[in-house]
Structure formats: C-alpha cells, structure tokens
Amino acid sequence: MEQGVMGVTMFFDTLSCFIFIPFLSLPDNPDEMNKFELTSAYHPTGDQPEAIAQLTEGVREGVHAQTLLGVTGSGKTFTIANVIANINKPTLILSHNKTLAAQLYSEFKGFFPNNAVEYYVSYYDYYQPEAYLPSSDTYIEKDLAINDEIDKLRLAATSALLSGRKDVVVVSSVSCIYGMGNPADFYNNVIEVQQGKNYSRNVFLRRLVDSLYVRNDIDLNRGNFRVKGDTVDIYLAYADNLLRIVFWGDEIDSIEEVDPVSGVTIARFDAYKIYPANLFMTTKEATLRAIHEIEDDLHKQVQWFENEGRPFEAKRLQERVTYDMEMMRELGHCSGIENYSRYFDGRA
C-alpha cells in the first residue's frame, strides 16, 4: 500500500469475512472516474439505510475500521455494495477461505454487472511440497495441479487493476499472494498496440515471448499465440476470446477480438493493451543478476553441508539448484521460481 493511503475494514459478522476499501483522495471532478452501477431489484430497508449512511460517512472521514453486524440473511453484502457505490473507489474484499470468496464474488458480480468484479484466490487444486529423505537419498518432487480457470481469473484481476479503471472490485482470500512476482515487472511487460502504428511483426512476436506467451501454431490454448503470415492470433491468458492482430508490412492494420471456435469477429479496437501470461514476471537483467547471487549462495551452502559431513544433502542441493539455474538461463523461468523471489525483488 502506498504511503498515506488509508482504509476502512468492515466485518460482515464473526468469522465471516471482511472488506477493505482503499481510501484514496477524491478527484476534483468525480465524473473523471469510472462509476459503480449498482444493479438490484431490492432497495435498502429497515436498518440498512442508516448503516449505509454511517459506513459511507466513516470512509469519507478516514475512519480506519468500522464493523457491520448482522445475522445471516440480513443483507450485509447488499449493504456493503451500496457503500461501494457511494464511495466509488477500487475495493478489495478479503475472505478467510476460497469457498466464501467464491460466494461473495458471485454476489458482487450480480450487484455490479457493468463493472470489473474480479476473483483472486490460490489457484492450486492440489499441492504437495517437495521433500528429501537423506537416509535413502530420495527426493520427492513438488507435485501440484493448477486450476486453469482460476489462473485466468487471477490474471484478469491483475489486468483490471493495471488498466487504470477505477470501478474495480477484487474478491480475494487471505492467502492469495503466493507465487506473485513484482507488480512493476508485470506492468513493464504490458504490450500496447495501436491501429495504424508502425510496429515490426518480428519485434511484436519477441515482445509476446518476453511476456511469457508461447508460440503454438497447431493447438492454440490460453497463453499461446500462432502466426499465419501477417496475422497473429493471441489466446489471452486472462480472457475467453482470441485477440487477432493483422499487420500490413511494419504497420498494424487491424485489432479484433475473435471467437476461438467460430472465428467470428466480436469487437474491433483502435488500441489494446496485452497483459503478460504469468503473474511472475521479471527482466533478463534481473534474471542474470539473480542467477549470479543464487550461485554464490549455492556454493556457500554446499560447502557448509560438506563441512558438516552431509554429502547427500550437498549433492541433492547442487543438482536441484543447478537444474533450476539452467532453466532460468534458457527459458527465463523454472518450476517453483517463486521460491527464488528474494533474489529477484529483495524479499526477505
């Protein structure tokens, strides 16, 4: 959070969930920002109008924490939706588990169908951490299964936040940030295209690869792109449709959103921002610097194991980290690269 940013925490009820609304300074002209459009067949009744007014006033006055109490089914989510519409600020909703987060996401999606309501939770369906048994020199690889749909929604949430729009609600769980890279590196790898602009096709393809999109001219899946002459189809990692960019020499001739099955054009754009295919982004310079630091620490740790009379651990560590560094050199990333976060962005 940036220095000087204040917020308000609103608890729905005990052990339910809480909402954090960033209290950003209001613009001089409120019309300059995107508006939240609350859609509901219901109207505030009973104690709801008073609760909405008090919570809204508290946020505007910079009250750090407010609590909303209510029994199950009393309309707490609807009350908070009205507060969000009144404040008209980007909102982060935190839940203590993925099940409740999914429920809240569905409800807020219904209240704000014309705004960017996004879902950001852990994308693992299954996760087994790596392990090593020195007695038998057995290494058990980390095993996991990533939910592609949740991965898409996570990328969509990140893209919405970086798009500049203000009408964004992100529903998340408290353990959601595992595996995230540096937001600045993610933003620096956003590709902006504009119709009629000079842009070498080959340079554009290299930018796609740098943003971790993979070329696949046969079986196009999310996070892939294909090339047919001057036409480049990109299956955006955070969307359900293709982005088709047609070049005319070194100029962008057209930008279209295309149905991946029928090939029918859904929309045309004058300009478009393509966000990276992976949340863990970094630069080549940062990767080379990180590899150098990893090598130094690897040498020290291997030496320590050997001095302690633990050759099996030394050998296993040498093999594993060396393999990871080779993958970083060749591909720019490796499986479990988040474990090396402290080398890329100085995490403790």
Q: What residue ranges belong to the model's regions?
A:
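Residues marking helix boundaries in flexible regions
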Residues: 20-22, 30, 53
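Cationic, low-complexity basic patches in intrinsically disordered or flexible, solvent-exposed regions
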Residues: 3
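Intrinsic-disorder-associated, low-complexity terminal segments enriched in Asp/Asn/His/Tyr and depleted
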Residues: 13, 28-29
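Exposed substrate/partner-binding surface patches
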Residues: 9
